[in-house]
Every structure is written in C-alpha cells, then in structure tokens.
Amino acid sequence: RITTVSRSYASEIRMPFYGEGLDGLLRARSKQLSGIVNGIDYNVYNPKTDKDIAVNYSVEDVIKAKAANKTALQKELGLEENPDAFMLGIVSRLTDQKGLDLVECVLDQICAEDVQLVVLGTGEGKYQDMFTYYSRKYPERVSANIFYSEALSHRIYASCDAFLMPSLFEPCGLSQLMSLRYGTLPIVRETGGLRDTVTPYNEVDGTGTGFSFTNYNAHEMLAIIRYAKKTYFNDRRAWNEMVLRAMKQDFSWDASAREYEKLYDGLIEEEARRKEAIRLQQAREAAEAALKEAEKALELAKRAEEKAIRKFSGIEDETEDERTETAEVEADKTPEAAPEPEEVTEVLETPEEAKEVVTKAKPEEKE
C-alpha cells in the first residue's frame, strides 16, 4: 500500500508533471494508492486558549473577537487601524512553488485597492525584496515580516479575514488548516490538499468554507480575491456564516488518525481474506486429489469384483494378451499332413520278379 497526504495529490502524482519520474509506476500501482490529509494539533492551534493572540474566542463569539484581534495586529504592525478593512494574510516560504510569481504579477493591483496585506516568512531573495518594496510603497496597507515567528503567525491567523495560498502544487498544506481553525477563510488554488480541505463558496446554495481558483493564472487569482472582498463588504451575513462553517471543520490529528485506522483495518481484513482464499484453494486442491484417489480405488475394486464373479462362474478372466497367447497355442496343435508314400525305385529285370512283387502287394482274400 502507498499512502500520500491527500486524495487529490494521490491522483496528481500519477501524471508526469507531479510524478517526478515515478508517474508510470504510480499509475501501475493506482489500486494500492491512498491519500489521507495531514492534521494539526487542535490544542496548540486553539483560538479559545491561544496565549499568543490579543483576544481569545470560539465559534460563539468569533465575529466580534476577529475585529478586536485585527485592530490589535494593525497597531502592532503599523497599519491603518480599521476593524472593517479587508485583511489578507500570507504565512509561507517565499518560493515559486507557493505561487508567489502569481502574486508578483498583480501585487500592485491588490495593494492599490482597499486591501491590507500581512506577510510572514523567508525564502527566495526576489520575493523578500518584493514584499519589502511594497511595504515601503504602501506602509499603511502592506506589512512585510521577512522572518518567522510562531507567535506572530498565530496572530495573523486570528486577525485576518482571508488567507492567500495560490500554490503551484501542494501535497497537503497546513496553513489553510490553521486559518480554518481560526475562522480565516482560505483563498487557494485547486491543487493537492488545498482542493481536498477547502470547499469553494457557492452563493446560490450558501455553502463553502473559502474561495478557490482552478488555473495557474495571476488574473484568475486576482479575480477570486476581488470576489472574496466583494462578498466581505456586500454580503457580510454570508461571510460570517462561512466563518462559522470554517471553524466547525475537523482537521485535527484525531480525524486523520481515524482515517489511517480505517486504512490499516482494511489492510488487515484484506490480508485475512487473502490467507483465507489460499487456505480454501489448498483445501479444494486436496479434496480434488482425494477424489481422484477414491475414484481410482473404486475402479480397482470394481475390476476385482468382476474378476471374482467370473472366476466363481468358471470363466477365466483372460486379458487381451492372454487371449492372444491362447490362440497361438491352439494353432500349434493342428494335425500334421500324412507323409506321401515312398517312391519305388527298384528296377525289375525279369517277368518272374515282377510277378513276385505283385503277389506280395495283393491283399490276402478272406476265406
């Protein structure tokens, strides 16, 4: 069995782009391939008890607490203090794989609109410089924190309204799970674990726990950011309901462990079935062999019975070879032909001698 960290990624790695040269093998083993998403520690990432955030909260009071945490973070980072501002967070390695080349293409447009952007992380120099530049260009809208702080990451999860993850590929992803836990709605590209853990918002039936876009395209990403911002400002009720649904999701390790338990139980049952199938096959083969032996013994017994009956009746039970041999013996007993009389070769010289021979050969007359 082969396991990976999400169902979608288990499908993706069967394709050349994601398979890294192993796609052919993984396609051949597709029936043995499973995907189970990672979990996060719900004790560590718990807005109700988190000591690193300004105001603790739960599902019951998340809306008010979000505004208070946002204001506290704005003050900490030197952003404009506005609880109604649309705050977008990024906590990530700053690399191409995380989709930051898409962000680079449209960052000017994002910052020019009514959006606050908070970035935390380190990585490639070009992205570090990019965010630093925009934080200086838009000091009240962009905060670039080019380092990593666990405590600050918790405050970003608790304070932001949305969390951006436009990854090129993402086997599972953890940041979107943390943001869901804190009621921050993920904006993700539909790949790997991001597809499996974030349900895109559907305004028709009022479902969803975040926002998503399909193609690896900067303008498609920008469009979904604008859609999220529009929903936040124009339909706050739908937004707040989505926040509640997000917080009620269970992506704890307990949930992941239950999935692994099901997988391993299935493997145990599968192995038991395999062994039982082998046992039944062996039993079937043994029964077939015993049946053949019984049939052979029955045939021998039948022949012995027939032979005994013939013997009791005075009939020799001759085999074909025996009958052939008997015929040959009888043929040898045929009477021999009588020998022909010997030819008379004596020469008679006188009439008296001839008369004497005739007299001897003539049978005597009975009186």
Give each language-model segment a name.
Residues 336-340:
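Intrinsically disordered, low-complexity proline-rich regions
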